[in-house]
Amino acid sequence: MNDSEFHQLADQLMLNIEETLDDFDGDADIDYETNGGVMTLSFENGTKIVINRQEPLHQVWLATKTGGYHFNYRDGVWLCDRSDRAFYPLLSEAASAQAGEEVKFA
């Protein structure tokens, strides 16, 4: 993957997250802000989830209340480099725990 492909894939990932949060109709208040390739999700209880690009490594990193994860793009999916778990299920799990209700990203 070259830098241009990485940027396109990472941009699409961030856009999907934004669209999911814009369409979220649950009771939890989840705000997001994107600045310089870093997206921060802020929850009512004061916790945060941070998603950022690591361009030199062509990775996307996810930092949640319970841990940090590094994702590589393989076979059409962002997969954790340690567990091979996909990005969206991990993000959904973390966001649901931090929001106190189900939040589903896909």
From Swiss-Prot:
**Which Gene Ontology terms cover its molecular function?**
ferric iron binding; ferrous iron binding
InterPro entries for the chain: CyaY, Frataxin/CyaY, Frataxin/CyaY_sf, Frataxin_CS
Q: Which Gene3D superfamilies match?
A: Frataxin/CyaY (3.30.920.10)
Got a GO cellular component term for this one? cytosol
Asked if the Swiss-Prot or TrEMBL record annotates the protein with the keyword Metal-binding, the reply is yes
**One GO term (biological process):** iron-sulfur cluster assembly
Q: Does the keyword Secreted apply?
A: no
Kindly state which keywords UniProt assigns to this record, in alphabetical order.
Answer: Iron, Metal-binding
Family, per the entry? Belongs to the frataxin family.
Role summary: Involved in iron-sulfur (Fe-S) cluster assembly. May act as a regulator of Fe-S biogenesis.
Q: What is this protein called?
A: Iron-sulfur cluster assembly protein CyaY
Task: Identify the species of origin.
Answer: Serratia proteamaculans (strain 568)
Q: What is the lineage of its organism?
A: Bacteria, Pseudomonadati, Pseudomonadota, Gammaproteobacteria, Enterobacterales
Gene designation: cyaY
